[in-house]
Amino acid sequence: VRTLCKQCRQKDDATSREALAAIVKPWKINGGYRPYKPVGCIDCRMTGFMGRMGLYELLTVSDAFKGQVTLAPDLGALKRQAVQDGMRPLRLAGALRVAEGLTTVEEVLSATPPLD
């Protein structure tokens, strides 16, 4: 996702904690919450963004997950088992970056698949 320009970003009071929580339901975002919005300056060529960052989803394959794959590779069951094993979806990783003030909700929504 694109990273907000640190020179010109402005605090975004319009993006509420509830709006961010809605895109990552049933997970919750704890801790600080500093949403910013892009503005544009000479440094970022009037885009409001400077650089990019990766969002990552890591799956540790447990014995239970291996059993799900071997017995009946049902996609829904595999997703549920992955979440039980501690996998965090891409959208949740993006929401954490929004809470840190590094990118915007719109960037995360455009770059990540919806939660099922």
Outline where the language-model segments fall.
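Short, flexible helix-loop junctions that flank or precede catalytic/ligand sites
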Residues: 1-116
